[in-house]
Amino acid sequence: MELTPRDKDKLLLFSAAQLAERRRARGLKLNYPEAVALISFEILEGARDGKSVAELMSAGREILTRDDVMEGVAEMVDEVQVEATFPDGTKLVTVHSPIV
């Protein structure tokens, strides 16, 4: 199977997000990479589902709360930027202060 670097990045992101979801389901607080992976993955999936950039920017702030992450992680994540594929092309989605 031949994968482009972008496809490899998406698979790595999926794996990290899946791990984060499992840890969160067990009641563990997420660290920085897990939190960013989970937010990024949800944005990519939302784009795939047909949501708009504006909808994803808003929804990106509802994925995690301070209670979901380790101490200090919310302050470390100023913004999350993801290039997502929409029906009309690839767009950069930026979520400011995603962990509230």
Curated annotation (Swiss-Prot):
The keyword Hydrolase applies. It catalyses: urea + 2 H2O + H(+) = hydrogencarbonate + 2 NH4(+). The keyword Transit peptide does not apply. One of its GO terms (biological process) is urea catabolic process. It holds the Pfam family Urease_gamma. It is an enzyme of class 3 (hydrolase). Transmembrane segments: none annotated. GO terms for cellular component: cytoplasm. Keywords: Cytoplasm, Hydrolase. It is found in: Cytoplasm. Pathway: Nitrogen metabolism; urea degradation; CO(2) and NH(3) from urea (urease route): step 1/1. GO terms for molecular function: nickel cation binding; urease activity. NCBIfam families: PRK13241.1, urease_gam. Heterotrimer of UreA (gamma), UreB (beta) and UreC (alpha) subunits. Three heterotrimers associate to form the active enzyme. Belongs to the urease gamma subunit family. HAMAP family: Urease_gamma. This is Urease subunit gamma. It comes from Chromohalobacter salexigens (strain ATCC BAA-138 / DSM 3043 / CIP 106854 / NCIMB 13768 / 1H11).
